[in-house]
């Protein structure tokens, strides 16, 4: 048998191949090897896919993974153009004494100079000077001494920094390029050179940003106190590499303020540092266990995270489970659409919690659903705080939106290369985002902050 080879037998149009024992073993080992290779490739692909499709990543972050479809919208016949009340995009003309008359010189077709002017066309343009160069100022300060207390001091004018070679307006421009335009240091210096004939080294730009961050330290500390005393907070965190190690950016968002802190921990010690042990406000968050530290707070767990988890269930029972949870979420939104009394809210909270308990008790019998039912059960009393208390959102979208800018910065710069860089970023990014939420003029606020603390 050991030396036998395979034989072919023909039955009509079918050919059956009889393999020898050695050939069967050889083929089996080959298939087993291929199977192991395919398994490893599958695991690697699934691991890569989990970076984009997981319960902690919102669908908006992965537009390329969304199915392409055309949404049908029934529109009544109407005139083309902007809807009634639309302000339009045409810029209003401005009064100016600057006039330029362009005269004809020759026919563009035959180059003849024999032509006549039959009319004129009016237009208005806004233009920058061909060369915008920084102004160099030699500054002389009086050194004064008080005749009463004998204190020696330098004269100030609230517009000229006491130290450094760069003025307030230039510092504001550089901060705009870094934090609003998201420019990296090298490209920022290239832009300043091309646009303003201002030659700066990347190190100089970095020093200006650090000086601005130090000027904002007092306001940043004040912002911390506002967040600590806020009655309602939306909190989220995301990873960020610092000197090759995994750190975390925490976002604390209230109705009017945003605080970013960058720490080497994702634990409850960060919550204790920022909010204190006795924080008793309302916190909207995901189910990360660090938030359990806030024992005196009212916690609202994020329904967006939960529904993303349940949507991954592919079995029949899993799909039914997801539909039940989606119906509860829709019920929350419908209930909160109207004004409710405290009594109505407590009654609805009790009813909804009991209903959710019943649902997870039923679906916990299915193996695929167990991870989601446990996820819910660990925080059962925290899923309907938005029903019990008015003005609370059922999702943590506010915090996720607040931290999105930091995620974009992470994609651009990759990592912070110094501990100082984390302090600079968290200070200026927090202040700028807060001014944006409060609809303040960022340029004016930066000028005010820098003038107050540096001049």
How does the language model describe each region?
Residues 1-162, 206, 224, 235, ...:
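Short, flexible loop/hinge motifs at secondary-structure junctions
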Residues 45, 52, 107-108, 146, ...:
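Mobile genetic element proteins and their domesticated derivatives, centered on retroelements
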Residues 287-289, 295-324:
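Conserved beta-strand -> loop -> alpha-helix junction used to position metal-binding or nucleic-acid-contacting
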Residues 117-119, 154-157, 242-244, 260-262, ...:
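Short helix/loop capping segments that flank catalytic or ligand/cofactor-binding pockets
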């Amino acid at each position: 048998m050991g030396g036998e080879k395979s034989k072919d037998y023909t039955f009509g149009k079918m050919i059956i191949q009889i393999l020898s024992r050695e050939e069967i073993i050889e083929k089996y080992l080959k298939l087993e090897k291929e199977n192991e290779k395919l398994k490893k490739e599958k695991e690697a692909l699934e691991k890569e896919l989990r970076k984009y499709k997981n319960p902690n990543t919102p669908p908006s972050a992965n537009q390329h993974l969304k199915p392409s479809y055309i949404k049908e919208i029934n529109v009544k016949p109407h005139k083309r153009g902007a809807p009634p009340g639309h302000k339009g995009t045409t810029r209003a003309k401005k009064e100016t004494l600057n006039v330029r008359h362009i005269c004809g010189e020759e026919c563009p077709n035959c180059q003849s100079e024999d032509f006549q002017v039959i009319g004129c066309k009016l237009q208005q343009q806004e233009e920058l000077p061909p060369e915008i160069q920084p102004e160099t100022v030699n500054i002389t300060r009086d050194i004064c001494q008080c005749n009463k207390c004998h204190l020696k001091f330098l004269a100030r004018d609230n517009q000229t920094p006491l130290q450094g070679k760069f003025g307030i307006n230039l510092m504001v421009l550089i901060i705009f390029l870094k934090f609003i335009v998201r420019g990296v240091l090298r490209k920022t210096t290239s832009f300043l050179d091309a646009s303003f004939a201002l030659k700066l080294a990347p190190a100089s730009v970095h020093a200006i940003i650090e000086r601005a961050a130090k000027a904002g330290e007092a306001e940043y500390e004040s912002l911390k106190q506002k967040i600590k005393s806020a009655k309602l907070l939306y909190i989220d965190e995301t990873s960020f590499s610092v000197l090759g190690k995994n750190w975390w950016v925490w976002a604390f968002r209230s109705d009017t303020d945003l605080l970013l802190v960058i720490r080497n921990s994702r634990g409850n010690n960060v919550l204790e540092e920022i909010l204190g042990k006795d924080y008793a406000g309302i916190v909207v968050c995901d189910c990360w266990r660090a938030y359990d530290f806030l024992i005196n707070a009212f916690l609202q767990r994020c329904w967006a995270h939960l529904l993303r988890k349940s949507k991954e269930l592919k079995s029949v029972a899993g799909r039914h489970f997801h539909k039940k949870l989606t119906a509860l979420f829709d019920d929350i939104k419908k209930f909160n659409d109207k004004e409710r009394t405290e009594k109505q809210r407590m009654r609805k909270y009790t009813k909804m919690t009991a209903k959710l308990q019943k649902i997870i008790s039923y679906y916990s019998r299915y193996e695929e659903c167990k991870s989601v039912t446990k996820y819910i059960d660990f925080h059962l009393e925290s899923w309907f705080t938005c029903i019990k208390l008015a003005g609370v959102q059922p999702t943590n979208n506010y915090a996720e939106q607040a931290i999105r800018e930091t995620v974009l910065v992470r994609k651009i710069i990759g990592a912070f290369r110094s501990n100082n860089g984390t302090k600079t970023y968290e200070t200026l990014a927090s202040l700028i985002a807060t001014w944006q939420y409060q609809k303040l003029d960022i340029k004016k606020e930066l000028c005010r902050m820098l003038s107050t603390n540096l001049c």
